[in-house]
Amino acid sequence: NDTVDKAFLKPIAQGYEAVVPQPARSCVNNIFNNFKDVWSSFNSFLQGRAFDGINSFGRVLMNSTLGIGGCIDVASMKGVPRVVNDFGITLGVWGFEPGPYLVLPFLGSSNLRDGTSTVAWFAYDYTPPYAPIFAIDNIPVRNSIIALAAIDMRASLLSADEMVDRIALDRYAFIRDAYIQRRAALVQGQSVDPNTTPEGLPKY
């Protein structure tokens, strides 16, 4: 993963950050986060966390309308925070243990529980939170949006990358521990910054 990232993904993300104005990048990031909020709301209800589910659904409604299709994160401006959630967290709430830490090809940090849920969704040809994008029939358009989502995600980690390189003695161990701590906090229902671990470490 590191080899592919350093040779391909990271340079593209750096170019994207250098060329695309910050307001445009924020718009793109907010739109993709709006898709994630739909998936977050669904999983919150599966976990019995109705307040979080209503919160996320309200964010989607607010940002999709007042926020011009999700381009502007009006909900956060109004004090409605993002709730990070996915099916791996749902399985954790239901009592499934995380299992060993894994690094999935192209997808990065995971564990046996989260990785299994990801593979299962792919096997059923359903890829939340971006299922509506994968349903687009126009292949060039669909692939372009998927590529943009990947670039946006990688660009959002550039500053975290710099911090890890600066302070981590063992990059692998640092990222592993950050991932494990963050996922455990999310399963326990702790409120975390969408872009960091509970201890302020970058999200991986």
Predicted regions and their residues:
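Mid-length scaffold segments of soluble, non-membrane domains
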Residues: N30-L112
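Mature N-terminal segment immediately following signal peptide/propeptide cleavage
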Residues: N1-K6, K10
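Membrane interface segments of multi-pass transport proteins and intramembrane proteases
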Residues: K10-P23
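A small/polar active-site loop signature that marks catalytic segments
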Residues: S26
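A structured, mid-to-C-terminal "fold-capping" secondary-structure block
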Residues: W94-Y204
